[in-house]
Amino acid sequence: MNRFLPILLISMLAYTAYAAGTVTLTGTCRSNLSNNQSINFSIANSGTESASSVVLQSYYAFSNKLTGTYSTSQISPGHAALFDINSSVGNNTGSFVYYFLVTYQQGTQIFTVVFPCVVQSHGTHPALIGINNVTVNDINSTTAKVNGSIYSFSSNTINGNITLILPPELERNGSRISGFAVNPYQYHNFTLYANLPSQNNTYSGAVALEYSSNGTTYSSVYIIKIIPYSAGQNQLKGYLVQAAIIIVIVIILLLVLRQRILRKKRAVQE
């Protein structure tokens, strides 16, 4: 259970493999703002190949408003790039969800990943609702259903918004709910939808929520992974093949045991 989530630092990992090399990016957000300070965000590459032509776009999650564009020529293995992101929080008080859409090139292929960041403005403001029990399941070969629940620790009814943070190719209608209401000390279930990846890569994303109370904004995030349909099917096929092999072995052992029992009975009768 993600109770309160007083997040000042969020790390999220993106992994891609192309040819013989890999790019493994970890994004780290440190942000406790006052007087409209910038958001400090770093991307480290722990893979074996460079991420080149890196472009970062920053967005406020609940408006999808572009707040800035940044770039660096490459992030080599074992190195990190540091970005100072302009904040649009201003003098507003509370916690706010931003996300950074990062596009990079590995070999001749271009990849896109997202990194969420909870920005604390004028102090730390933990949310009184948490995101829980999130599952991601395929509906068909193109669509995933994201189910979960929200639990309220507040003595008052909370009204807010909830959304998925995803790379653009995974976004679709039904990825956002507005105007949810959670009763005091109760669960509220939600369902969101995402497109499944067309390429055989696993994507990271997030469920984010936001609400306001007495002039202060509160936010929370929950990291998710979306696996391509083919990868999920291949994994299922692998399990089915293993189960079939085990069943065949058991049948063979039972037949051998039966033959031995019959031979013993014949020997006794003779």
PLM region spans:
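Membrane-proximal extracellular "stem/stalk" segments
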Residues: 116-235
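Secretory targeting signatures
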Residues: 1-25, 233-270
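Surface-exposed, proline-enriched loop/turn segments that connect beta strands in immunoglobulin-like
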Residues: 25-30, 68-72, 131-135, 174-178
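Short glycine/proline/serine/threonine-rich loop/turn segments at secondary-structure transition edges
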Residues: 91-99, 198-205
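Intrinsically disordered, low-complexity Pro/Gly/Ser/Thr-rich segments with frequent PxxP/GP/PP motifs
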Residues: 60-91, 168-198
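Aromatic/hydrophobic beta-strand junction motif of beta-rich domains
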Residues: 39-47, 146-152
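Hydrophobic beta-strand segments
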Residues: 54-59, 162-165
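Solvent-exposed, conformationally flexible loop/turn segments
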Residues: 28-36, 75-80, 93, 108, ...
